């Protein structure tokens, strides 16, 4: 192969397009029937099909792909499936926006059709982005949660958990979004710091402070701290609520903070979670003052039909007019918002379906899982410890997995579908048997399942649960963002334990969020959003993947910086130049000769490079086993650029272009071994570039080849030390030439090396000079040859006379001036006047004489290098 046959410039887009068309994606397929190789199943995150595979998705999939490609090369039977989490609120909202409707304005089946159509189109768009980024997805194991083949498993899991007592139906307070008109889980509530007012109100015996005066209609008690002497006489007494007139009891509870407001608070149904605790603890009545649309109910009296903000202002006005409101103070508070639409949530009591939380089981399973990084486990532990309510899994939406339940119209009993009936929509199908009471008339469950009920069985699904395959649980790894530890990770562990009694995975790798170039979270409003397509179009997929690899360690947030992508693109060109140069010298090298190349034919610098190469293989293997992508790729890039290109190639050019056939063949063997190994090491990270490199070594894909093995016989600290000496000597000689303005290939009369025994051939070739190893120690005479005045001292002190002093100094005998410096004072005569100078005012330049020759001495640790002029 000649250098001219390989293009000088690396055209990334052309190469990437070529391999996208050529690759046979079946090489990424998981073999369900094989047990000879260890399995490596990845519980891939199924993103919402929004149509936009955003940069945060792309970063996470880079991590997943690094692992998948690496594990295949390590001999694992890898499954890298791709799923799509279709159901849920985002899709419904988008359909409503697109068609200018609300979900209740069209038939249920028609609305579901619109959602499916939008979702299918979005999946196609996102799939193309994933292919463009070179992700080695096993598309034969793709799953789509809106398809019956998947949601039948969601329904089966519901049926089994219900029958096993893990799921129940109950009228219970839940978080409610009035805008979306659905219950939401605590994990879906986001909090924002906001400004409100604390209102001070006269009740008939005590004064209370509240931020929710609109809930006075739902006041069912007043609470004070039992240690608060201000109110001890009223504990157990009835108090009348102003404006609304109901009588409530004043109770004592330790949870009341005497220092807050007046020290007396309303208990309403429901203003916050604390109200729910007190309501349950004291068996208080339930008054529903707010409906599902966020409007005041009949219980609010004349305020019925008002929105919550309207009612709040009206009540405050009426309290003020009646003399009950006597003060208001500004207050900062955390407001719970719907994760999707940012509407303030309410707590309503509605019949809902719940999953029981097994706190101890989840924490025990979390301890059995390897966390990368380890500290991320604390987030799950903290969340589990704060869970007070069970998981509300019913949603008042349409586009989601139907709950396979009917209610008997005669006796009200629940009829749950049998597994053989699934998949089923109770709104379109009736039960296939009568109720125990004999009735055949049923009311279908119109609520649907929380989308996390779909995605929390992904580990089970990809492991073969309820399929024709044997169950392979646990999966080996779950890669995900830290923002969904309390949802996806938590719910998946819960469900795997409930359904199979096993942890879902062996390990979990957490990635951070992607920040914009300005360091802030990417958002359209800030104008700092970067799309993966923008990067691949301007640079390349491999450049983008490099940014993903080196941008940060697992668990940390990663800032997107264009300069990192530019650096990545430059590395591709640099690596291509290294590869092109190496291949141009391998046209007459037979790869078969590399199989049993005699190690005693290698030069010191050859052994140095091969030892470093094998240490690189050893370290990258260890780092990738620990999912340390940043340190791994930086090490590979540093080796290629600094060790191989900047040093080894410069040192062996003399052999490559010279007449010494044996020396040239040794260098060829090293180049062949190193470039081929680098193509394998780079394959998980920059698959297109690595494939292009490897294609000139082998007709098979690099992605079907084995990861390099460490050759311990080539690892030698002695060889590395000797090689470092050769590298350092050559580098110092090249710097010496540069300082003198000489061309780097300009010959020197002679280079003498003392105090070490090393190969000199490569030094001679790299410096284009005669090199001789010398025995013994050199002797040097340092002869003063020039007086160099220090104008930094003389100028400011003598000003206009400085020039004359400089001239006089230069006329002095350098040896005489050196002797005066040793005495501590220099005297010089200028225009008949003697002037005394401090030693710092001059410098003596000396020539080094060795054996009667003028020489220069280079300072190198472990050796003395003499340059004969």
From Swiss-Prot:
GO cellular component, one term: cytosol
GO terms, biological process: valyl-tRNA aminoacylation
Its EC number(s): 6.1.1.9
Nucleotidyltransferase keyword on record: no
Main localization (coarse): cytoplasm
The keyword Protein biosynthesis is annotated on this UniProt entry: yes
UniProt motif 'HIGH' region: location: 47-57
Short motif 'KMSKS' region, span: 521-525
Localisation: Cytoplasm
Entry domain remark: ValRS has two distinct active sites: one for aminoacylation and one for editing. The misactivated threonine is translocated from the active site to the editing site.
Protein's UniProt name: Valine--tRNA ligase
Organism encoding this protein: Methanosarcina mazei (strain ATCC BAA-159 / DSM 3647 / Goe1 / Go1 / JCM 11833 / OCM 88) (Methanosarcina frisia)
Phylogenetic placement of the source organism: Archaea, Methanobacteriati, Methanobacteriota, Stenosarchaea group, Methanomicrobia
């Amino acid at each position: 192969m000649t250098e001219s046959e390989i293009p000088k410039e690396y055209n990334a887009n052309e190469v990437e397009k070529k391999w996208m068309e050529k690759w046979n994606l079946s090489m990424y397929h998981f073999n369900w029937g094989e047990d000879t190789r260890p399995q490596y199943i990845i519980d891939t995150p199924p993103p919402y099909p929004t149509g936009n595979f955003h940069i945060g998705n792309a970063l996470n999939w880079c991590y997943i792909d690094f692992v998948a490609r690496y594990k295949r090369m390590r001999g694992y039977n890898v499954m890298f499936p791709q799923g799509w989490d279709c159901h849920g609120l985002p899709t419904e909202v988008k359909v409503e926006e697109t068609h200018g409707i609300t979900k209740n304005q069209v038939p249920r089946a028609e609305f579901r059709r619109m959602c499916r159509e939008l979702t299918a189109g979005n999946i196609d768009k996102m799939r193309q982005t994933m292919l463009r980024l070179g992700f080695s997805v096993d598309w034969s194991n793709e799953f789509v949660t809106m398809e019956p083949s998947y949601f039948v498993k969601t329904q089966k899991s519901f049926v089994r958990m219900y029958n096993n007592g893990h799921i129940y139906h109950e009228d219970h307070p839940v978080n409610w979004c009035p805008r979306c008109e659905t219950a939401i889980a605590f994990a879906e509530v986001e909090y924002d710091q906001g400004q409100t007012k604390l209102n001070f109100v006269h009740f008939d015996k005590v004064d209370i402070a509240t931020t929710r005066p609109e809930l006075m209609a739902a006041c069912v008690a007043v609470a004070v701290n039992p240690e608060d002497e201000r109110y001890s006489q009223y504990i157990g007494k009835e108090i009348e609520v102003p404006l609304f007139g109901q009588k409530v009891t004043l109770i004592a509870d330790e949870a009341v903070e005497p220092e807050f407001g007046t020290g007396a608070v309303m208990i309403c149904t429901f203003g916050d979670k604390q109200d729910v605790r007190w309501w349950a603890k004291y068996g208080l009545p339930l008054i529903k003052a707010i409906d599902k649309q966020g409007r005041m109910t009949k219980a609010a009296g004349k305020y019925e039909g008002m929105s919550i903000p309207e009612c709040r202002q009206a009540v405050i006005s009426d309290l003020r007019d009646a003399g009950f409101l006597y003060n208001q103070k500004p207050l900062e508070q955390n407001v719970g918002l719907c994760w999707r639409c940012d509407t303030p949530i309410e707590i309503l009591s509605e019949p809902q379906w719940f999953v029981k939380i097994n706190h101890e089981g989840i924490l025990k399973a979390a301890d059995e899982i390897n966390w990368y990084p380890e500290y991320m486990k604390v987030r799950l532990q903290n969340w589990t410890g704060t869970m007070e309510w069970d998981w509300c899994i019913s949603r008042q939406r349409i586009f989601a997995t139907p709950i396979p339940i009917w209610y008997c119209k005669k006796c009200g009993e629940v009829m749950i579908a049998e597994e053989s009936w699934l998949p089923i929509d109770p709104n379109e199908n009736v039960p296939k048997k009568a109720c125990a009471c004999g009735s055949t008339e049923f009311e279908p469950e119109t609520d649907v399942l929380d989308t996390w009920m779909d995605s929390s069985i992904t580990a089970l699904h990809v492991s073969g649960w309820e399929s024709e395959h044997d169950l392979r649980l646990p999966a080996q790894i779950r890669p995900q963002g830290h923002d969904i530890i309390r949802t996806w990770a938590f719910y998946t562990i819960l469900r795997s334990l409930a359904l199979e009694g096993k942890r879902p995975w062996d390990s979990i790798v957490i990635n951070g969020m992607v920040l914009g170039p300005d360091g802030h979270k990417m958002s359209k409003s800030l104008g700092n959003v970067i799309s993966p397509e923008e990067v691949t179009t301007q640079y390349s997929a491999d450049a983008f993947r490099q940014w993903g690899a080196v941008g940060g360690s697992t668990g940390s947030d990663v800032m997107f910086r264009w300069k990192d992508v530019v650096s990545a693109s430059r590395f591709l060109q640099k690596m291509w130049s290294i590869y092109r140069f190496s291949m141009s010298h391998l046209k007459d090298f037979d790869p078969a000769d590399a199989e049993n190349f005699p190690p005693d034919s290698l030069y010191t610098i050859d052994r140095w490079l091969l030892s470093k190469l094998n240490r690189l293989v050893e370290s990258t293997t260890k780092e990738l086993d620990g999912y340390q992508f940043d340190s791994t790729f930086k090490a590979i890039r540093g080796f290629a650029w600094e060790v191989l290109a900047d040093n080894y190639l410069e040192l062996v050019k003399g052999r490559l272009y010279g007449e010494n056939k044996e020396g040239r063949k040794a260098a060829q063997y090293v180049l062949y071994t190193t470039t081929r190994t680098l193509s394998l090491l780079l394959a998980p990270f920059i698959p297109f570039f690595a494939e292009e490199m490897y294609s000139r070594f082998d007709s098979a894909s690099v992605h079907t080849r084995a990861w390099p093995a460490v050759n311990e016989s080539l690892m030698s600290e002695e060889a590395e030390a000797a090689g470092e000496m050769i590298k350092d000597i050559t580098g110092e000689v090249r710097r010496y030439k540069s300082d003198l303005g000489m061309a780097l290939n300009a010959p020197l009369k002679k280079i003498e090396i003392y105090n070490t025994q090393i190969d000199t051939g490569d030094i001679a070739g790299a410096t284009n000079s005669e090199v001789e190893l010398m025995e013994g120690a050199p002797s040097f005479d340092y002869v003063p040859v020039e007086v160099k005045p220090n104008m930094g001292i003389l100028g400011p002190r003598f000003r206009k006379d400085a020039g004359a002093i400089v001239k006089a100094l230069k006329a002095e005998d350098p040896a005489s001036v050196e002797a005066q410096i040793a005495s501590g004072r220099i005297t010089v005569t200028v225009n008949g006047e003697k002037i005394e100078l401090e030693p710092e005012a001059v410098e003596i330049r000396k020539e080094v004489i060795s054996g009667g020759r003028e020489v220069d001495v280079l300072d190198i640790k472990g050796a003395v290098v003499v340059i004969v002029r």
